[in-house]
Amino acid sequence: MYHQLILMALIGVIMANVVPFSMSNIPEEYKEFIPEEVKNFYKNLTQEDRQILRELASKHATFANEDAALEALKNTSDKLYQKAVELRNFVKAKIDSLKPDAKAFVDEIIAKVRSLRPEDGQKLDMEKLKQAARDIIAKYEALNEETREELKATFPNTTKIITNEKFKRIANSFLQKN
């Protein structure tokens, strides 16, 4: 079960950071595992919103940090900026509520996932993604029980998803070494 928790956290962060700007590009069998907040963010995007996000994503390497990217978004579309900030604040509040060990673990996951973001014009390297998931799982298993329980309590939807048999099959299949 711990493997699936980490993979779901990894998938959630990836979805929030590198997912296509249309939910229709995501295979049906994976849509149910996307966090509701991410789905809500994408649900009401207009074609113009999607285009703005595509343009900003294509320039991701030029932004020093998340704040710089948000500032560029604000200069382009205040409405879209507000939606992005709302999603960011939701996630940030959850992370900030964690005790130091759990917070450090989540921060490490986020940094690892950001490092996986492909360069402009490149595709996501699935082998690097699988290795990152394996590394994160190993670190998760090294956490004490109290920290694991805190992560489960703070991210209850993730816990609900990881107990899903379909998700377990997909996660185990995904992590198989080729």
UniProtKB/Swiss-Prot annotation:
GO molecular function, one term: retinal binding
Subcellular location: Secreted
Chief location category: secreted
Gene3D superfamilies registered for this protein in UniProt: 1.20.120.1100
Listed name of the protein: Fatty-acid and retinol-binding protein 1
Listed GO CC annotations: extracellular region
Function in brief: Binds retinol and different fatty acids.
Gene name of the record: far-1
Range of residues in the leader sequence: 1-16
The family this protein is said to belong to: Belongs to the fatty-acid and retinol-binding protein (FARBP) family.
Transmembrane segments: none
Glycosylation (residues): 44, 75, 157
Coiled coil: 67-89, 122-154
